């Protein structure tokens, strides 16, 4: 695993920055697997994992040392044991034709390919319930 860059985020948090989402997911899995007391939260994003700590329980320097050590562990990112969720999608957005044109397919083909793909939430955004989806099919 690549050594992440550490970016301070005040006295109670820091970001671990890597190059891409495919590095974030195993990094998050490694951190979650060895999470010590004092780590309040682990928040994955597109290229970072935010680590929030309680400095009364785990000094920030010790937290950074733990995180960098955990980052050297190779872990597979595992999907949570939850059943798939199927959603009804209306493929009638104003940008459907433009998106299809960019992909050099027609709107029906774009809708078919999108509907047949398996998607998973890689991380959530700042708005409650807004998940960023990824698919191995795209």
Feature map (PLM): residue ranges:
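Conserved "landmark" site that anchors the functional core of diverse proteins
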Residues: 1-138
């Amino acid at each position: 695993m690549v050594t992440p860059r550490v970016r301070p985020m005040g006295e109670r948090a820091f970001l671990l920055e890597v190059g891409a989402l495919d590095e974030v997911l195993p990094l998050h899995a490694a951190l979650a697997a060895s999470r010590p007391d004092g780590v309040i939260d682990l928040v994955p994003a597109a290229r970072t994992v935010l680590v929030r700590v309680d400095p009364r329980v785990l000094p920030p320097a010790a937290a950074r040392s733990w995180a960098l050590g955990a980052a050297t562990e190779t872990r597979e990112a595992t999907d949570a044991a939850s059943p798939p969720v199927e959603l009804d999608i209306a493929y009638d957005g104003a940008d459907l034709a433009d998106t299809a044109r960019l992909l050099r397919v027609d709107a029906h083909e774009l809708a078919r390919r999108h509907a047949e793909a398996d998607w998973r939430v890689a991380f959530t955004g700042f708005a409650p319930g807004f998940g960023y989806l990824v698919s191995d099919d795209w």
